[in-house]
Regions:
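Short, ordered secondary-structure scaffold segments
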Residues: 2-74, 82-85, 96, 107-115, ...
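Conserved hydrophobic/aromatic "anchor" residues
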Residues: 3-5, 102, 121, 128
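A short acidic/small-residue loop/turn micro-motif
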Residues: 66-68, 77, 89-90, 122, ...
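Flexible glycan-contacting loops in extracellular carbohydrate-active proteins
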Residues: 94-100
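Two-metal-ion RNase H-like nuclease active-site motif
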Residues: 100-106
Length: 140
């Protein structure tokens, strides 16, 4: 899978090399961390979803344009994905509509990590995989 991002973060283009498909995600009214809604399109058909976030900014539910639940997500306090449910309450094995979840960041589901932009975070270890490049007080 290959992903492209717009300069302002309002559009993601996801190219799936396995099935040769392309998906466009438009963040409406903000970027991936603040938008209240998204429009997902394959270039022909499109679907509007509203993003429901918790106090950390994690996307915990997506609803369609009629207010029906499309996907519900549950995270532990460290960002580990506990459960994903579809509209009927069936358990899914991964995030299906949007790969952003904990604190609005991108989940790299094949390896179980979260891309926090500057560093990768492992929710199972509760640790970042790289040191912080910006250390304010190195002697403390």
């Amino acid at each position: 899978m290959l992903k492209h991002y717009s300069h302002d973060g309002s559009v993601e283009i996801v190219c799936n090399k396995t099935d040769n498909s392309t998906k466009f995600v438009f963040y409406l009214g903000g970027d991936a961390y603040s938008a209240p809604a998204i429009l997902i399109s394959d270039g022909e058909a499109s679907k509007l979803y509203y993003l429901h976030r918790d106090y950390l900014g994690s996307i915990v539910m997506l609803t369609d344009e009629n207010g029906n639940i499309a996907e519900r997500r549950y995270f532990d306090p460290w960002g580990q994905l506990i459960k994903v449910e579809d509209a009927a309450g069936n358990t899914l094995d991964k995030l299906t509509l949007l790969d952003r979840g904990f604190t609005g960041h991108e989940h790299l589901q094949t390896v179980g990590l979260i891309n926090m932009n500057a560093r990768l975070y492992d929710p199972a270890l509760h640790r970042f995989l790289q040191p912080d490049n910006y250390v304010q007080e190195p002697l403390k």
